[in-house]
Amino acid sequence: MESVLDQFDAYLGLERGHSDHTRRAYRGDLTALFDFVEQRTGERSLARVSLPLLRSWLAEQSASGAARTTLARRTSSVKTFCAWALRRGLIGVDPAARLQVPKARRTLPAVLRRDQALDALDAVNSGAQEGDPIALRDRLIVELLYATGIRVSELCGLDIDDIDTSRRVVRVLGKGNKQRTVPFGEPAHAALTAWLTEGRPQLSIPESGPALLLGARGRRLDPRQARTVVHQTVSAVNGAPDIGPHGLRHSAATHLLEGGADLRIVQELLGHTSLATTQLYTHVTVERLRAVHDQAHPRA
């Protein structure tokens, strides 16, 4: 069974262009499924997977308290896997074809207020005044994530040549290997210049290659390190929600819309395939307006 899962993992990476994070999620979901199959049938085999068994698997997880979002993701993982197995001739009938994806309740993302975002940026900028390479790198991480709204995996995957400093744009390779160009402002440009001229040369080693961001040992920065940087930076801001890079992405999108940006432009900047995903941020701004109205209007 593991060899089949290895083949599916290769398909997700090479043909679907999924990130390592997404592929690990698929692998975890399918491993959990086949643990259940083996427990129920005594065989760890694709041939033993049936629609009733899949429904029992999801029902058991639901009864154990799995969130609706988790159930929806696992259903999607299984449906993608079974459809692939059918095309490869590994099964004659797709047992997941009629499996319904539970609708996940969409929750409004936690975002920073504008003043909180500026406080976080001020803090990370003040910490980079001494020329310490790690501080200069951390400044760039936060500035670039907020300026562009890119994903942390996209940030850590950037090479130096992906940055056009004269035009102040970054070329991003997003989900599905789709490339997009995202602009950034003067504060991020200043952070980038300081990192490239003062910070990166202090950490660079032959193994650094073209990577834009480096870890303390000179190799390409791991997304987990970038997440830690964002969490630590934001946690120092009084009253700010506990967010990481994805929360900073949410914040950038929300502030763009609050500033009057067109929804489809924001969709393009974020690399969303569906406009419906971007529209979630309009609900955030409406909720904020409602909160202000409730507090300030005498007839609220």
UniProtKB/Swiss-Prot annotation:
Gene3D superfamilies reported in the protein's UniProt record: 1.10.150.130, Intergrase catalytic core
Q: Which residues form the active site?
A: R151, K175, H246, R249, H272, Y281
The answer to whether keyword Kinase applies is no
What GO molecular functions are on record for this protein? DNA binding; tyrosine-based site-specific recombinase activity
**Gene Ontology cellular component?**
cytoplasm
**CDD domains, per this entry?**
INT_XerDC_C
Q: Which UniProt keywords apply?
A: Cell cycle, Cell division, Chromosome partition, Cytoplasm, DNA integration, DNA recombination, DNA-binding
* Domain Tyr recombinase residue range list: 107-294
Q: Does the keyword Secreted apply?
A: no
Location comes to: Cytoplasm
GO BP annotation list: cell division; chromosome segregation; DNA transposition
Domain Core-binding (CB), residue spans: 1-86
Q: Which Pfam families match?
A: Phage_int_SAM_1, Phage_integrase
Q: Classify the main location.
A: cytoplasm
Q: How does it assemble?
A: Forms a cyclic heterotetrameric complex composed of two molecules of XerC and two molecules of XerD.
Q: What the protein does?
A: Site-specific tyrosine recombinase, which acts by catalyzing the cutting and rejoining of the recombining DNA molecules. The XerC-XerD complex is essential to convert dimers of the bacterial chromosome into monomers to permit their segregation at cell division. It also contributes to the segregational stability of plasmids.
Q: Which family does it belong to?
A: Belongs to the 'phage' integrase family. XerC subfamily.
What name appears for this protein in its UniProt entry? Answer: Tyrosine recombinase XerC
The coding gene here is xerC
